[in-house]
A protein has these predicted regions:
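Conserved catalytic cores of very large enzyme subunits
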Residues: 105-482, 503, 509-681
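Buried hydrophobic packing segments
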Residues: 32, 36, 242, 246, ...
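Core structural elements
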Residues: 79-85, 289-290, 472-496
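Charged, amphipathic alpha-helical regulatory modules used
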Residues: 2-119, 123, 480
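Catalytic-loop motifs flanking and including active-site residues across diverse enzymes
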Residues: 28, 32, 238, 420, ...
């Protein structure tokens, strides 16, 4: 080892040490001397005097490499190893290396253990943050079972499936591997036409249903199908062209509006019952064509094994009935007026969309009030309506191009979806490589490579488990993961820009915006390479990362207290993907203009939320907002998000209200009446 050349002013010793949990501790040279002395005594190669000299040498190297800095504990131990080797104390060096390896193994084993008592008690006392992490899962026995099982499954993935460097990158917050608590794929889109034509059947030993002949039985099979498949996947389950494929039942049975509405009510209610593992509501998405797609117009539907004497293109009136009924039920809500969360509706907006129709008025009235729907832009984006079905029949996929997954953030096109999602902590990269874009992109490339490796491992494992029968219904209706994407996401690009420039720029400035575009182009180029190398589909997603964004920020603050973040020191977070900072603008068209070229870089799920401070004045205003957004901008998906409150007594209230104004008014009126009665009693 080469000793640093002495200078007039010796470098300052490191000020701190980064521990394995990310916490900072005061640098203590005595601990290095003690460790070397114990190692020398164990081998008999040297005593305390030589140990002190070796410790001084190691400290000089540390001061030279990290003057006044904060090396990681592993980096300090690396220097100690190098010092022992340079001094030719080979027996001690080998013993020290073996000791480090044993300790690393013990730490890894400890991470795979789950403390049964604390895990159960943390859930029962609600001390575990996971109890409230999922809005779709309530505090329940099923939630307890899922919580404890999820910890075991996550440790299995990180310690026994993924390579050590992948597990380490996740644990230390460089990347976030989503849905580690489930030994399954992420999300899937299914062919509703296949279900309606073949029925819910084909799994040995399970009850079988023939193809439905009426809408009521079709609705029952849809609910059972989505609920059953949800148990085999971690994320959203989706059907496309719902109104197109269900319309033949309306025509065949001559159903009136009341009958169609009853069927929609039964379906929507049953899909909001917490029937999923962990007492959760199934996460479901339905895509509505509104106007029959061109590639289906001449095709003949089959009901109960019989071809119908009409084509899908003949059923616009029936599609209108279905859309009207669905919107009516979703707008009305449950028995107490509470809005239904699922299925999330996605509407395909094509050039022939009837903006001025009565149904369109109902759709935008619902949107103005609740903001439920997602709108898929087939007017002015790269998306094409037939893409939702093209994935299952393209025999030769061009892996040199990045394909669109279709149907937005929570939906998937027919017979496709995502095997898994890995999100990169971009804010950390901006901090660590401030001012050096080449170094930042190089580090990003390494993390993307780790993400790709983890997704390839997951794809192989899930396919093998499917072949073994662990996912019987997925095996029956899908069979293989050929058309499923491996998804990579980014998080905290706004904070990446801020940290990279030490707070001088953010994503809203021209420079920061251009930097974000360069980063997304870099990611797209890398995942194109992954496609060509692996033969598997990849996409870039603006991953929601609701939990990951807080986890990233908390991990980074432990290591670097001066890192820039959103939120407060107690509740830090990073801005999702490449979104604008929270509260930056209340002008939806400014948000659209600033996000247009960023949003079009994503090939997987992405959606721009147009946040409104309160309910939009009327359906016409909402319709014009959506129309202008989709015709003037190239964003693939948007959703309107008005602010509203729900009172347990009075239900829906436009705008944000910490307390119900109607309840307050009633209490004041009651108080006044009581005072008046008291005054009258005294007067009498």
């Amino acid at each position: 080892m080469t000793t640093p050349t002495p200078s007039a002013a010796a470098p300052a010793m490191p000020a701190a040490v980064i521990q394995r949990d990310g916490q900072r501790a005061v640098f203590d040279a005595c601990r290095i001397r003690s460790a070397i002395a114990r190692a020398g005594a164990a081998t008999g190669e040297f005593g305390d005097t030589q140990a002190a000299l070796l410790a001084d040498e190691a400290c000089r190297v540390l001061a030279y490499r990290w003057p006044g800095g904060a090396p990681h504990i592993e980096q300090i131990q690396d220097v100690v190893e190098q010092t022992l080797v340079a001094a030719r104390h080979m027996a001690t060096a080998r013993a020290y290396m073996a000791y480090r390896q044993r300790r690393a193994t013990l730490r890894a084993d400890a991470q795979t253990l789950v403390d049964v008592q604390s895990s159960i008690n943390e859930y029962l006392t609600r001390a575990d943050w996971r109890v409230n992490a999922n809005a779709n899962q309530g505090y329940s026995l099923g939630g307890l079972i899922l919580n404890v099982a999820g910890k075991v499954t996550a440790n299995y993935w990180l310690s026994h499936v993924y390579a050590p460097e992948i597990g380490q990158a996740h644990r230390e917050g460089d990347i976030h591997i989503h849905d580690l608590d489930m030994l399954s794929g992420y999300c899937a889109g299914w062919s509703l036409r296949t279900l309606l034509t073949e029925g819910l059947n084909g799994v040995p030993g399970k009850v079988e249903a023939a193809p439905p002949k009426h809408m009521s039985s079709a609705v029952g099979q849809i609910v059972n199908f989505l609920g059953t498949l949800q148990n085999e996947w971690a994320g959203a389950q989706a059907f496309s062209s719902f109104d197109t494929y269900m319309a033949p039942f309306v025509r065949k049975d001559g159903m009136d509006y009341a009958a169609v509405r009853q069927c929609m009510q039964e379906m929507i209610y049953n899909l909001n019952v917490p029937s999923r593992w962990g007492t959760q509501t199934p996460f479901t998405n339905l895509t509505f064509d509104w106007v029959c797609p061109e590639d289906l117009r001449e095709q003949v539907p089959v009901i109960g094994g019989e071809e119908m004497p009409f084509a899908y293109g003949d059923l616009q009136a029936e599609m209108d009935l279905i859309n009207r009924a669905y919107i009516d039920v979703m707008t009305t809500g449950d028995a107490k007026g509470r809005v239904f969360t699922f299925p999330i509706p996605t509407y395909n907006i094509t050039p022939d969309f009837p903006w001025e129709s009565e149904n369109a008025g109902r759709l935008f009235a619902m949107t103005a009030k609740y903001g439920l729907p997602y709108f898929q832009n087939f007017i002015n984006s790269e998306l094409k309506p037939n893409m939702v079905r093209s994935m299952c029949c393209r025999l030769q996929l061009d892996l040199r191009e990045l394909l669109k997954r279709g149907n937005g953030l929570f939906g998937s096109a027919e017979q496709t979806g995502s095997v898994g999602v890995v999100t990169v902590n971009c804010a950390r990269l901006g901090y660590l490589h401030a001012g050096d874009e080449a170094a930042l992109l190089d580090a990003l490339g390494r993390l993307l490579e780790l993400g790709s490796q983890s997704l390839e491992v997951k794809r192989k494992l899930i396919q093998r488990l499917m072949d073994q029968g662990l996912f019987p219904y997925t095996r029956r209706y899908l069979g293989m993961l050929r058309n499923h994407f491996s998804t990579l996401g980014v998080n905290g690009i706004n904070e990446m820009v801020r940290n990279f420039t030490r707070g001088e720029q953010d994503i809203t400035t021209a420079w920061g915006h251009a930097f974000a575009l360069r980063l997304l182009d870099f990611v797209r180029k890398r995942i194109t390479g992954f496609q060509e190398r692996t033969g598997h589909l990849y996409n870039l997603e603006a991953s929601p990362a609701e939990g990951a964004t807080y986890r990233f920020a908390k991990e980074d603050l432990k290591r670097w207290p001066d890192i820039l973040h959103a939120g407060t020191p107690g509740k830090p977070y990073y801005t999702n993907s490449s979104q604008l900072p929270v509260g930056f603008t209340d002008d939806p068209f400014e948000a659209l203009a600033r996000q247009e070229d960023l949003q079009t870089k994503y090939t997987g799920g992405t959606v721009l939320h147009l946040y409104m401070g309160e309910r939009i004045s009327d359906a016409a205003a909402c319709r014009e907002l959506v129309r202008r957004a989709l015709t003037r901008f190239r964003l693939p998906y948007i959703t309107v998000t008005p602010t509203f409150s729900v009172c347990p007594v009075h239900g829906y209230l436009a705008g944000e209200h910490p307390y119900c104004p109607l309840c307050d008014a009633e209490k004041l009126a009651a108080k006044r009446q009581a005072i008046e009665r008291q005054q009258q009693a005294r007067a009498a």
